[in-house]
Amino acid sequence: MATYYCAETGQASFLNFRETTPAEQTSLLDEHSQENKAFQIGVPGQTAGIYALWEQYGSMSWDQLLQPAIQLARQGYQVTPSLLGAIELIYGEMASHPELSEIYLRDGLPPRVGDVIQNEPLAQTLETIAQNGPSAFYQNLAQEIEMSVQSAGGYLTADDLLRYQPFAEHPATGTYRGYQIISSPYGGS
């Protein structure tokens, strides 16, 4: 989700690119969804949303915009106490997935504060998206994503990815102590 305000025109806009529910998922989350995390996977909108924002407001090339994220994934970042806490919280889950273990665990154990985490597969995916736009994610990788999610019990399909579109909405507005407040019409972080 993104709220944008143009000081020159005084106009505000809101772009919704939250995840959506897969078309084949007919029930809401229930007690079984806690056991099957893949059931909770929605249609991701981040890539399409950022691209739409870039098309409308961007001032650098798409490739330049993604370079810092590519560099961070490739060169890595240090484990902070808060990141370590998050990893320890889902350690059992991570340990059961070799792809996650290889990136986030050290010899099968949580990393230490100060260790560097590198994610070369993410760097390569971001490079592909930087070169080919969001279609690299929503079309080219769609079958691979579908197979991965469905093999784990989720509902996400390649067709869900292909159909995903961010959409514009009116932002929430109000006044507080003489200041105009412009925000998302939904709760979010």
Descriptions of predicted regions:
Residues 1-139, 143-187:
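Noncatalytic scaffold domains of N-terminal-nucleophile
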